[in-house]
Structures are given as structure tokens and as C-alpha cells.
Amino acid sequence: MLDTKFDELMEFPASFPFKVVGDASDTLQDRVVAVVQGLAPGDYAPSTKASSKGTYYSVTIRVTVTSKEQIEKLYTQLAELEGVKRVL
């Protein structure tokens, strides 16, 4: 598990943005939403932007999180998605 200090810095529940950067893929946004739905079910409206050369996509999604552990699980599972380079 990650060693973060989210519990010291935040009050829960909280709205928390995740930005997932990965290889350009038409399915990246759907895969990000599927991971988020598995840990924090809700109605999400993520935004996707292509890099200047179109090589990468970034998907930004705002999630209502309820604990430090939930944030850590989201970071871990999003980072494990195929083609993902970074989770910010």
C-alpha cells in the first residue's frame, strides 16, 4: 500500500481530481471510468484531451472519496491500466 498523508491533509468525504495520462486509445476514458465505478460508484463526466502530437490522452475525473485508503486504491488500480503512463 502507498504511504500517503491524505488523512492528515483532507477531510472526508471530499471531491478529489485524478488525471490519468496514457497512450492515445479510444477506450482509455471508458477504462478509467470502469475502475472508478468499481471503487466509488457514481455518475461521472470525465474530460479527455489529446497531447499536441496526439500520442497521449489525459483523462481528468473528479471523484468523491471517503478515505485515504480509497484514494490509494484508485491511484494503484488506475496506474495498472494498460497503456497508462502516469496518474496525477
UniProtKB/Swiss-Prot annotation:
- Cellular component terms, GO, for this chain's entry? cytosol
One Pfam match, by short name? DUF493
What name does UniProt use for this protein? UPF0250 protein swp_3927
Domain of life, source organism:
Bacteria
| Record family assignment | Belongs to the UPF0250 family.
In terms of Gene3D superfamilies, this protein maps to: 3.30.70.260
